[in-house]
Amino acid sequence: MGVSSRIRSSVSPETLRALNQGEIQEIVSDYRKTVENALEAGFEKIELHAANDHLLQQFLAYKTNQGNDQYAGSIENRARLLFEVLDVLTEVWPAERIGVRLASGSYRPLPAVGCYIWIV
């Protein structure tokens, strides 16, 4: 990958690695807390971002999700985190006021179409 900025950062890039179950549960809890904060702040709707190489999209992608656990492999497993987050969000927020942003454009090869059809 190329450098996206000519400005030097004091933060070193981290080597990608699979998340463990505890880290995944922390992430799900973080999504819940974020939605609780949005509700308290008076937001009327929320959008769960699962596109543009954000974390949830990385779990959906064959290219980035090459693990061998319950979150990898089949479409059902790769979508598991997305649905776990949605389950937690709908405990706090009305489902009809939650949108999900999906984008298959960054996937290569394109078995992603089947993934998105399954999710929707």
Predicted features, each with a name:
Residues 1-18, 58-79:
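Aromatic- and acidic-residue-enriched carbohydrate-binding clefts of CAZyme catalytic domains
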